[in-house]
Amino acid sequence: MPSSFDLLGEMIGLLQTEQLTSSLACPLPNALTKRQDLWRALINQRPALPLSKDYLNLEDAYLDDWRASFVPVSVKDCQKTNYTSLFLYHGDIRYLAVDAIVNAANSELLGCFIPNHGCIDNAIHTFAGSRLRLACQAIMTEQGRKEAIGQAKLTSAYHLPASYIIHTVGPRITKGRHVSPIRADLLARCYRSSLDLAVKAGLTSLAFCSISTGEFGFPKKEAAQIAIKTVLKWQAEHPESKTLTVIFNTFTSEDKALYDTYLQKENNCE
């Protein structure tokens, strides 16, 4: 079985031979981390076009190795809160072994094309594998228009421990600007649409990232309040959906502190 180092080298060679990306003349690095960065840059930039069976076999082997490098996190490993159906998980959402994780997507729904970008969309698409971009392309081709803010789409999670990914596009907020009622409602719609889709698909566990708080600039405090209030209100309006466990995933210490505070009933997100 080839090592991850060798698999990366072969994938890079195939991607460079395609000449579909801008990073064509880079020599093959000798360091593992440099190879990882170059492969990720190439696959991040690659258009949503079919891939060869040879490449997909290599990618499957490499991502299987990645998947075996950590212990997946289940609902029972997550932090309990004062609400029996709400949990917290602080860490990398890609490690969650739940029915579905929520991806903060953009209106193209094809993932992030910026090489090695730090957004959640990039991380999820990269390590789910390139079949995810192709699946999203099929959705967008059938839809025939950009994805509207506040809607939700379901795909397989491919190489991630989760079974599915729910993709939703949140609202953008210019830094320093007040959160208008319209944008607050658009963010709430992201949560409602994701919950509705999860129930429609028969899912029993759903993990939300902090939608719109990264590249889209939504203030973290307001976003956390909207997220929790919206989910609690949705649960109250859908008593038949008590089997759906919701996990709020936090990645920064600021987000964790906010959710820790607001998920105490006495605070009530005010």
UniProtKB/Swiss-Prot annotation:
Name the SUPFAM superfamilies on file.
Answer: Macro domain-like (SSF52949)
Q: Which UniProt keywords apply?
A: Glycosidase, Hydrolase, Metal-binding, Zinc
Span of domain Macro: 73-267
Q: Does the keyword Metal-binding apply?
A: yes
Binding of Zn(2+): at which residues? 112, 117, 119
**Enzyme Commission no:** 3.2.1.-
Q: Which reaction does it catalyse?
A: 4-O-(ADP-D-ribosyl)-L-aspartyl-[protein] + H2O = L-aspartyl-[protein] + ADP-D-ribose + H(+)
Q: Which PROSITE patterns match?
A: MACRO
Q: What does this protein do?
A: ADP-ribosylhydrolase that specifically reverses the SirTM-mediated mono-ADP-ribosylation at an asparatate residue of GcvH-L, by releasing ADP-ribose from the target protein. May play a role in the regulation of the response to host-induced oxidative stress.
PANTHER family assigned: ADP-RIBOSE 1''-PHOSPHATE PHOSPHATASE, GANGLIOSIDE INDUCED DIFFERENTIATION ASSOCIATED PROTEIN 2-RELATED
Q: State what protein this is by name.
A: Protein-ADP-ribose hydrolase
The record lists the organism as Streptococcus pyogenes serotype M6 (strain ATCC BAA-946 / MGAS10394)
